[in-house]
Structures are given as structure tokens and as C-alpha cells.
């Protein structure tokens, strides 16, 4: 069986390396695989540079493709594996809340808050992670040996291996290309005599480095949505170079969860012109961003706070500071944000994002030929809506936070019509916290899958993941399942089914195959539910007036 050596599969670099690992000539450099995984039968090409270091004058600016020619052979060692990381402290409180809920034990919000913010001194940056660097615009390519041995395909020639590109989650402030181990997916792709698929993981700038925005920032020479521009350059790199690894540039699928899934939607609507994107298919899992949390004043305040924390008065001065100063300032800014608030992320900029991506999809400003597989979880918002929402006043404050960028009539409509204070079972909630959870799920994640399907003309497929606790991101361990030894808490039956569906979609554009339950072609009404109690077709919970309303709101 493919999963009998689960412990080795857990390490993508577990190596019984041949004496001469393969080398690929990218034009600007020659890059050698760092290892060969003898269990999974694939090569790992890690830390391939796809952009010049975003340092100095290139900070807060669009990425620049590599230029020149290096005479040396590189293998990716000694480089920054991840971009500077940060996490809002309130997420640590939420993790304690969801753990208590899962265990069925009481939760003391005030005690948890005190522990995180005071005892743990969460807002102060910890010692720098040696794998973290501003010079982080790299990608990893994992190539099955059978694919590599067939030789590189001629540029743009069809017939190469399918390619799965993964954009990580992390609320636009954390995460890296190395967070997930693709060994299980690669093994699944090699079943039934197939040569398998190529897997690519991408780093993109996070936090202040990738997502500052607003009038002051832009007028100072900053470029909003630099993180999206990084992703775009990496996807274009794949179109130009993946044939050198044996991949087919016309068979690229981009997959992402949460921030990664939200980014995919913005890549679909890039520039608002319906242009052909640098991929053929997408898999979006809980595609998330918070469209209503930004206002011009909030954007300017974030920028001012960032400069003040650096003790500078201009972006040019910030660009000249040492990296550790910027990294620490980024951490403090993100860590100290108000409870429940998304901090940094995509913003309407009149360029890459000319309008709300929700409305751009409604207006048909995405390429309709892209094939789509979507999913969301059954309890998306439970672990994200603040744990201290227990009464009408706290719910109203949350509405104000989530919809700060809208006018008062939208906030009133949300609180009285879409999510009224009715707890008799006639609404999909019975508590104030569940009411807030549904607001977040609809506004930030679940409904986005519906909008994406409606914007394309190709047959699409939709899944709901309801394996308990079915929280936001709880399907990720199933996607990257590596067998019962490596992942003993994962429902292996559901995980292997989900992996087969993903791999089939990557290969053929259709997730179905014998003997698995069929995922119906999405019609706006039904989808396939994956749960501990079975797999069945059921009504899509996004088929409601709430989702219809949020797509049309001006954020």
C-alpha cells in the first residue's frame, strides 16, 4: 500500500538520495533537487527563487522577476523558508475557547484573555525564527520520479504532467509554502498506474510587507496588495518554467484554503477585466477575506501606527531600516489589533482589485472558462467569532467591527433582517455567539464559493466538510493526510476520499470516479456532504437570501 511507510511520508525531504540529484536550468540559475524521497518516489526542488529579494527600495513595491545569470548550481539551502510571520493575540484566546468547546468544559474568557495578553506577553515579539526572512519569495516543486524521467516538455507543449499549486492559509499574516506536506497527495496521484502530478508551494509577502494599503500608504509610494502581485508573478513563473520539470502549463490547478482560497478568487477577478489567468482550474476551500473591516481611516491609522512604531515619518525611511526592526514592528502591529478584527489583507486599490471581488464575480469580470471545485466547512465561524459575544450589545459591537466599511443601513439590515435576535430555532442559531459565527461565515467565507460558481460557465463541483468539529481550516489535515500512523486523529476514510476527489479534479477537471460517491455537478442547490456519519448529497446551505445580499453590498 502507498501509505504503509507513513512516518517517512511525513517528511517531504526524507531521502535515500541518488548520487547525482537532477538539475534544472531555469535560465537565470541552475537549481538542483535537494533530496529524493525513496518512499514517495519524488524529487524535492526547494527554495527556487521566483523574484528578486524584496529589500530596500523593493520593499512595499511590486515584485521583480529574477534577472542575470548565476554560474553556480544552487539547491535552496541556507535561504529564508518563510516570510516574516505574525498572529493576532486574540487568536490564541480563540484557540483556548474552541478546545474547551470540543472537550465540553466551561470556558472562562477573562482568565484566558489575561493569560494570553499578560502572562504570555503575547504582543511582544519572540526570538526571531532562523527560517524567517524578508528575502522569502521562493517556491518549492515536488516532482514524481516517473514524471522527471520522461524529460522536460517543450515550452507550452501539451502532454506533460498535471500541476497542483498550493497557496497557504494564515489570515494574510502567517503561513508558508512549507506548512503542509504534499507526500500523501503525491502518493494518491500515483495510484492506478499514473505517473502522478507535480506539486508546487509558494511563499508570498505577509502582514505589513504584503498588505498595507490606503491613501497615505499609496501616496508615499507604497503598492497595495503586494502579496497578490507576488502570487501572480509566481503563477506566471510556473507558466514559463514548469515544463522543465515535466509539467504541462495548460494543466495547472491552483488550490488554497482560507487566505489562500480568498487569494484565488482575487486572482480570478484580477484587474476586473475577465482576462485569462495563469491557470486552468481552481480548488477553493473556505475562501476567506473580511470585506467590511476596512475604511480609509482604518487603513491610514494602520500605516501611521506602523511608521510610529519604527520611529520614522515616511515610507522611504522605513525602507532603509534593518530587517529586524520591520519584522518586530509587523509583529507588534498584528498582535495588538482589537479583539475579533482581521488586521491586514486584500484591499480595493483601483488596480489589481478595482472593486469588491464579490461584485466583480456578479458582473462577470472573471474568466468564465476556469473549472471550479469548492468546499466549505459546516461550522466556519465558530472558532473565529469572538468567544465573549454573549448578549445583544456585544453582537452589535461585532457587527460594527465586521461592517465598519459600510453605511449604517447595511449594519442595521444585518442585525435586524439577516441575523435577527431570534433564538427559537427558526434561524440557523440559538445563541448570540452562533449568530455572530454565522455572520462571519456568510460574509467572509462560505458565500464566496457560491459567487465563484455563478461566475463561470464550466461544470463545477461543491463539497461541504462536516466531520466534527468542522471548524474553519479543520479539513486541512484531511487534504494532507499521510496515513494513520502520521495522522491518527484524522478520519482516514473521509480523508482518502477527499484526496481522491482532489487528485481526480487536478488530472481531469472532474472529481468523480469508481467506486466513490458521486459529487454532483453544482446547480446552486445541492452539494456533496462529507461527514463522520456518511457521505450524501444534501441542500447547499449557501442557497439563501443572506448570501445574495452580501454580494451586492458596497464595501
Swiss-Prot record:
Signal peptide: 1-16
Pathway: Mycotoxin biosynthesis; patulin biosynthesis
Gene3D superfamilies: alpha/beta hydrolase (3.40.50.1820)
PROSITE patterns given in the database record: CARBOXYLESTERASE_B_1, CARBOXYLESTERASE_B_2
Biotechnological relevance of this protein: Patulin was originally used as an antibiotic and specifically trialed to be used against the common cold, but it is no longer used for that purpose since it has been shown to induce immunological, neurological and gastrointestinal effects. Genotoxic effects of patulin with dose-dependent increase in DNA strand breaks in brain, liver and kidneys have been detected in mice. However, more recently, it has been proposed that patulin might also have anti-tumor properties.
GO CC annotation, single: cytosol
Residue spans crossing the bilayer: none
Keyword terms: Cytoplasm, Glycoprotein, Hydrolase, Signal
Example GO molecular function: carboxylesterase activity
Source superkingdom: Eukaryota
Residues bearing glycans: 37, 75, 311, 388, 491
Enzyme Commission designation: 3.1.1.1
Catalysed conversion reaction: a carboxylic ester + H2O = an alcohol + a carboxylate + H(+)
Binding positions (substrate): 258
Active site: 258 (acyl-ester intermediate), 380 (charge relay system)
Subcellular location as annotated: Cytoplasm, Cytosol
Enzyme class: hydrolase
Record-linked PANTHER family: CARBOXYLESTERASE
Function: Carboxylesterase; part of the gene cluster that mediates the biosynthesis of patulin, an acetate-derived tetraketide mycotoxin produced by several fungal species that shows antimicrobial properties against several bacteria. The function of patB in patulin synthesis has still to be characterized. The pathway begins with the synthesis of 6-methylsalicylic acid by the polyketide synthase (PKS) patK via condensation of acetate and malonate units.
Family label: Belongs to the type-B carboxylesterase/lipase family.
Protein name: Carboxylesterase patB
Taxonomic placement: Eukaryota, Fungi, Dikarya, Ascomycota, Pezizomycotina
Gene giving rise to this polypeptide: patB
